[in-house]
């Protein structure tokens, strides 16, 4: 029902309504959409669980109506926010309502801000339909690129992207997407009224984005991604000016059309100016990869050149976004003895020495050669830490039961644990050492057994004796069964050495949940 109301509003006059989103703030169905668990997935980040505040649907509906009434009276809303700032740590009776109002305003406004972005993803009926390749959306598609390119490079800049900046700059970045001035004023008012909250640590560059408030995560992810999109637009533009050959991008820009319109205009205006500044940055073997708050800038150039890039990036953020990026957030490392954590893998460039026997007439001699190979392995210790955070084991890796699942049926419990194991095997199929996953599967197997034993008020030994030791055999699925999308399970030939073969799937569009625990740690 709420979706139909929103669609009807946007269909009245598409061009007019897209530029005038402010009335949606006063519509009750917007806040219903914001807290509908079925629509809680933003187009900018993976689904996140909304932290409950202890209210039921009936009482929350009344509070939403009261919030809308207060927003019509601006002074009343300001007093409510100020009252929350003063009493949130004192336990005041109004603290709950103020907390609820702040969460609802944040989530509701996030839904509204997403509308201009989501409309760009929906093709018009008049436009020519361009065939889409879903394979290019796969996370695994980046690893063959790294495997092909990084093994020939010398240095890498491991960048922890600084984040931001002054609140007003965040609003200014959104101006190119949202033409509705009242909505921008409302966002500016909301941010400045709550700038002293603990959940607004984004204005302190030394703080990690992991401290963002869970209540406001959806809104601040939009703000953060708009900032990253703006910085990458400027960075890619300057990079293209430093070399005459047109660079290509392997990632999908949400604003692809808008991006190229702006870059074509800027090239005509600023071409001569930037060529004089960036002449010493020419490097035909420069590659940039980013995921969330981390980026990799790899080069085949010398140490002096990569050091110049580091200095340039520090000044880049300072002069374009008006904040100081500390140099220690950018590390220079040679590929020969460096490994980095990226997308749930520990990646490195291995040097494999080999000797070749040569014969010339009657003389024999050996020629030593060195070859570089891009290698990816499963980070076992970090995965155990993720299992510990998810309450499957202790910090030392000792399996424990999952009490919250003990109320489910036996088939549901085994299905959940089995799905986790299959997803892990599927996602980490690109590892060159798959035997390390056996320890993870062992932890999940015993955790499942202890959860079943907890439900039946028994021990693991008695449970396995009663139900059979083959009950949990699916947790040790062989590799030839894991890669069943390519080779059917009825294959007549064994896949020898499959535990060493790396397979990159093209149907993975999001990082595994267990690997995702470590992205902002």
From Swiss-Prot:
Which GO CC terms are listed, alphabetically? chloroplast
- InterPro entries in the cross-refs: Domain_X (IPR024937), Maturase_MatK (IPR002866), Maturase_MatK_N (IPR024942)
| Pfam families linked | Intron_maturas2 (PF01348), MatK_N (PF01824)
Where the protein is mainly located, per its record? plastid
The record's GO molecular-function terms, alphabetically, read: RNA binding
- This protein's source sits in the domain of life called Eukaryota
**Protein's cellular compartments:** Plastid, Chloroplast
**Keywords in UniProt for this one?**
Chloroplast, mRNA processing, Plastid, RNA-binding, tRNA processing
Biological process annotations from GO: mRNA processing; RNA splicing; tRNA processing
Instruction: Report the function annotation for this chain.
Output: Usually encoded in the trnK tRNA gene intron. Probably assists in splicing its own and other chloroplast group II introns.
Check the record and name the HAMAP family matching this protein: MatK (MF_01390)
What protein family does this chain belong to? Belongs to the intron maturase 2 family. MatK subfamily.
Please name the PANTHER family in this protein's record: MATURASE K (PTHR34811:SF1)
Q: What name goes with this protein?
A: Maturase K
Tell me what organism the protein belongs to: Trillium flexipes
């Amino acid at each position: 029902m709420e979706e139909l109301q929103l669609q009807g509003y946007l269909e009245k006059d598409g061009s007019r309504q897209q530029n005038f989103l402010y009335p949606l703030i006063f519509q009750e169905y917007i806040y219903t959409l914001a807290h509908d668990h079925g629509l809680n997935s933003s187009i900018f980040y993976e689904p996140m669980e909304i932290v409950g505040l202890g209210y039921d649907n009936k009482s929350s509906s009344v509070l939403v109506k009261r919030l809308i009434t207060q927003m019509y009276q601006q002074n009343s809303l300001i007093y409510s926010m100020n009252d929350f700032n003063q009493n949130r740590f004192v336990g005041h009776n109004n603290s709950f309502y103020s907390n609820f109002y702040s969460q609802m305003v944040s989530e509701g406004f996030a839904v509204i801000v997403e509308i201009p972005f989501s409309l760009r993803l929906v093709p018009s009926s008049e436009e020519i339909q361009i065939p889409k390749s879903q394979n290019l959306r796969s996370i695994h598609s980046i690893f063959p690129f790294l495997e092909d390119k990084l093994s020939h490079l010398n240095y890498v800049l491991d960048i922890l992207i600084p984040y931001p900046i002054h609140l007003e700059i965040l609003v200014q970045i959104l101006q190119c997407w949202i033409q509705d001035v009242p909505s921008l004023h409302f966002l500016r008012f909301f941010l400045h009224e709550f700038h002293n909250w603990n959940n607004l640590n984004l204005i302190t560059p030394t703080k990690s984005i992991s401290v963002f408030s869970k209540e406001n995560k959806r809104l601040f992810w939009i703000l953060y991604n708009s900032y990253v999109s703006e910085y990458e637009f400027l960075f890619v533009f300057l990079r293209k000016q430093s070399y005459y050959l047109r660079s290509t991008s392997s990632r999908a820009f949400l604003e692809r059309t808008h991006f190229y319109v702006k870059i074509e205009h800027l090239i005509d205006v600023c071409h001569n100016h930037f060529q004089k500044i960036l002449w010493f940055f020419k490097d035909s073997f420069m590659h940039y990869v980013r995921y969330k708050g981390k980026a990799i800038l790899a080069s085949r150039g010398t140490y002096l050149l990569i050091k110049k890039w580091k200095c340039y990036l520090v000044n880049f953020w300072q002069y374009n976004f008006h904040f100081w990026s500390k140099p220690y957030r950018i590390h220079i490392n040679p590929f020969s003895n460096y490994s980095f954590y990226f997308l749930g893998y520990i990646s490195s460039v291995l040097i494999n020495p080999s000797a070749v026997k040569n014969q010339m007439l009657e003389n024999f001699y050996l020629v030593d050669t060195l070859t570089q190979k891009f290698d990816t392995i499963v980070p076992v210790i970090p995965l155990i830490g993720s299992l510990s955070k998810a309450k499957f084991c202790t910090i030392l890796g000792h399996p424990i039961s999952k009490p919250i699942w003990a109320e489910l049926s036996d088939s549901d419990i085994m299905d959940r644990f089995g799905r986790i194991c299959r997803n892990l095997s599927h996602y980490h199929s690109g590892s060159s050492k798959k035997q390390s996953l056996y320890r993870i599967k062992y932890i999940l197997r015993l955790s499942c057994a202890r959860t079943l034993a907890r439900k039946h008020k028994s021990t693991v030994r008695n449970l396995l004796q009663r139900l059979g030791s083959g009950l949990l055999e699916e947790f040790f699925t062989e590799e030839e069964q894991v890669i069943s999308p390519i080779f059917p399970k009825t294959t007549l030939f064994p896949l020898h050495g499959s535990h060493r073969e790396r397979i990159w799937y093209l149907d993975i569009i999001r990082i595994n949940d267990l690997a995702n625990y470590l992205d902002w740690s």
